[in-house]
Amino acid sequence: MVLESLSSSLRETIRKITGSTYIDKNTVKEISKDLQRILLKADVNVQTVLNITKEMERRALEEKPPVGMAHQDYMVKIIYEELLKILGEPSNVELKPQTIMLVGLYGHGKTTSAGKLSRFFMKKGLSAGLIAADVHRYAAYEQLQQIAESVNAKFYGDPKEKDPVKIIKNGLEVLKDAQVKIIDTSGRDSLDSDLIEEIRRIKEAVKPDQVLMVIDATMGQQAGPESKAINDAVGVTGIIITKMDGTAKGGGALSAVAKMRVPIYFIGTGEHMDDMEIFDPKKFLSRLLGLGDLETLFETVKEANITEEEAQKSFEKLMTGKFNLKDMYDVWEKFSRPGLMKKLVDSLPLAKLPGSQKINDDQILTAEQKLQRYRIIMDSMTFQELENPEIINAKRITRIARGAGVREEDVRMLLKEFKAMKNNMKLMKGNRGFKKILQSNFRSGNFGLDDLGLK
């Protein structure tokens, strides 16, 4: 998950608050110290951290929660609102024909981001073309060409031409049928006069609709000064922060860049070409705190091609204990695409579930591998066995294991976990709070933020 360490610590703090018998001055002080430690570890500026926690303490001790809201939930609401202040305003990514120019230093992920951007717009129904205008970095042309092929985007480049302006103008003509044209420009090891002059010359000649600066999240707070320097020199319309999944400093990078008052358009959340998302401060913070991001959850379900009717049917079967192996197989098959399960888990309101634990990337990978093995096992079952797992005896287990090329123990483990899941659902059936969460996920999409008064 993006900012896994930060998220895990913040979710633990949320659980500490919601698990408190009451909120008094000592509790507020303790939570304040926890937040300071967590945010400083994430490389957020010291003064920013002090300002956040000071205001959080003041509000927690002076303000009274609305009628019907518990002090614990109101405390979470205050933390949410104070953290939201340092993440900037929502971006306005327009889904229309446009020309986008990417700028930034070497190694920050411009070329990969160009591919992810093209993939993003193509998923939204717009055709995309990539233009290789990095004339300095070795193999930049070949890398972007390979990326374009991997996402089925159009491509233009001229490895023999050393004038980026000529390349781009020719590229815009060749790719005139592409609705979104993305220009990958050269970088430098540091911001120098040559880089600034080249970017200015391209911008003046091409007049792109958007100039997006690509920043590496591993820079932490230092992302702020660098972003400001490039923005002051050439003027940018938005920012892409990359590698948010691989650093503990992402929180510092986000808060530092947000101070520029230039919107953060996208964040890179993984290695796959699908791992780029529009940066929405409210959605991002909700996921970070474990309050859920139901909009992303439903987008993920949509990506898996699960209809609302199918989701509702699965929910009803789960809650009535009628869920069988065939139903389980159908769901797993839809979420088998790489990265989709991770995206789903990150969107769930786990901090609201009593006794829930943080699910890390290694656990998700292990689960994906296990589910793949279980799908192979179920492929060796008859329709009757999938519909009625109770009939699977020792003889059938032996046959299924041989057909799937696995151990009999693996088949037994699948049946054991399926039975445990059904039993857990029966227990949860009487838990109205848990049922409310599940129903919200399948139906309304309003749980989490609405329940805390955050929307």
Swiss-Prot record:
Reaction catalysis annotation: GTP + H2O = GDP + phosphate + H(+)
UniProt GO BP: SRP-dependent cotranslational protein targeting to membrane
GO cellular component: signal recognition particle
Enzyme Commission numbers on file: 3.6.5.4
Organism domain of life: Archaea
Keywords: Cytoplasm, GTP-binding, Hydrolase, Nucleotide-binding, Ribonucleoprotein, RNA-binding, Signal recognition particle
InterPro entries in the record: P-loop_NTPase, Signal_recog_part_SRP54_M_sf, Signal_recog_particl_SRP54_hlx, Signal_recog_particle_SRP54_M, SRP/SRP_N, SRP54, SRP54_GTPase_dom, SRP54_N_sf
Example GO molecular function: GTP binding
UniProt entry tagged with the keyword Nucleotide-binding: yes
SMART domains per record: SRP54 (SM00962), SRP54_N (SM00963)
Residues involved in GTP binding: 104-111, 184-188, 242-245
Pfam family of the protein (one): SRP54_N
CDD domains per record: SRP54_G
Location(s), subcellular: Cytoplasm
Comment text on domains: Composed of three domains: the N-terminal N domain, which is responsible for interactions with the ribosome, the central G domain, which binds GTP, and the C-terminal M domain, which binds the RNA and the signal sequence of the RNC.
Subunit and interaction comment: Part of the signal recognition particle protein translocation system, which is composed of SRP and FtsY. Archaeal SRP consists of a 7S RNA molecule of 300 nucleotides and two protein subunits: SRP54 and SRP19.
Membership in a protein family: Belongs to the GTP-binding SRP family. SRP54 subfamily.
PANTHER family referenced in this protein's UniProt entry, alphabetically: SIGNAL RECOGNITION PARTICLE 54K PROTEIN SRP54, SIGNAL RECOGNITION PARTICLE SUBUNIT SRP54
HAMAP family: SRP54
Function: Involved in targeting and insertion of nascent membrane proteins into the cytoplasmic membrane. Binds to the hydrophobic signal sequence of the ribosome-nascent chain (RNC) as it emerges from the ribosomes. The SRP-RNC complex is then targeted to the cytoplasmic membrane where it interacts with the SRP receptor FtsY.
Name of the molecule in the record: Signal recognition particle 54 kDa protein
